[in-house]
Amino acid sequence: MARVKRAVNAQKKRRVILEQASGYRGQRSRLYRKAKEQVLHSMAYSYRDRKARKGDFRRLWIQRINAAARAQGITYNRLIQGLKLAGVDVDRKMLADLAVRDEATFAALVGTARDALSVAPTSS
């Protein structure tokens, strides 16, 4: 049976892992076994946090909208309810951007929501 020489592949595999761990502190950037373990954890964290980022931004947008809405004298949930009743299809990202950058347009949307809430029948 022929002898299998794997030195090149093994060195490449180790080099790739050590390059991925190049910014880590201490042994995690120099020793292959520690670096491999840390790279695996890092990849898992980055996968998890790419999913979590979406919720984080949604929460940030809601906080910004709520702060701007309360400055206009209406709460966040009443604003969203009024915009839905008025048929205004603006997502939270756009609303938060308007609240920060264009207060006049945001105030107009708040007025639209108030009008829709005052016209809407109340359920009892």
Curated annotation (Swiss-Prot):
GO terms for cellular component: ribonucleoprotein complex; ribosome. One of its GO terms (molecular function) is structural constituent of ribosome. The keyword RNA-binding applies. Keywords: Ribonucleoprotein, Ribosomal protein, RNA-binding, rRNA-binding. Gene3D superfamilies: 6.10.160.10, Ribosomal protein L20. Pfam families: Ribosomal_L20 (PF00453). InterPro entries: Ribosomal_bL20, RIBOSOMAL_L20_CS, Ribosomal_protein_bL20_C. The keyword S-adenosyl-L-methionine does not apply. One of its GO terms (biological process) is ribosomal large subunit assembly. Belongs to the bacterial ribosomal protein bL20 family. Binds directly to 23S ribosomal RNA and is necessary for the in vitro assembly process of the 50S ribosomal subunit. It is not involved in the protein synthesizing functions of that subunit. NCBIfam families: rplT_bact (TIGR01032). This is Large ribosomal subunit protein bL20.
